[in-house]
Amino acid sequence: ACASASVAIRQGIIGIASGLYDVVLAGGVEKMTTLPTNETTLVLATGADMVWETYAGYTFPGLYATMATAHMNEYGTTSEDLMAIAIKNHDNGALNPMAQFGQTVRDVMNARAAKAKEKGRPVPSWADEMEFLHDPAYNPVVAWPLKLFDRCPITDGAACVLLVAEEIARDFTDTPVYIIGTGQASGNALHDRESLT
């Protein structure tokens, strides 16, 4: 799941560079919303080390929370730093009409306040997005120190890239994008890493 599309692109580049192919269509697809959340979570958990991590009770949020805690201890990263990332990411997503979440954190905050008013509940009055993200009623802890807005959703998506040999690129476009390098690496399971950061 996590890297199959990028590996497909790299394999396409290698295939073209070797002369084996002139044209490669590389893509990736992820369809995760047809299963109930608990089943999807179980499937995702198989990406972790089944002997040491999954059976010890780790979930993916728990693994990332462990790394976040280590980063906080080693570099002084704060929850506010993570909140700033969430705000920035939602701001960028709001600029993309195809984004899963086309709302800024401020949009979400205002919608929550409007919903509370509509339901006759006390209307929260957050000063800004940071104060909203500090509110555990709207941004609960998923796996400390990570909160709801720090996590990625279960989602569907797909993308593809048409790769062509340089000598025929102009047959497809007047402004080709050139790939000047590629690389690939793989990490160890969390318990085998020398550093969690």
For each feature predicted by the language model, list its residue ranges.
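Short acidic, glycine/serine/threonine-rich loops at helix termini
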Residues: 35-40, 94-98, 190-192
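Conserved catalytic cysteine-centered active-site region
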Residues: 1-24, 31-63, 106, 121-151, ...
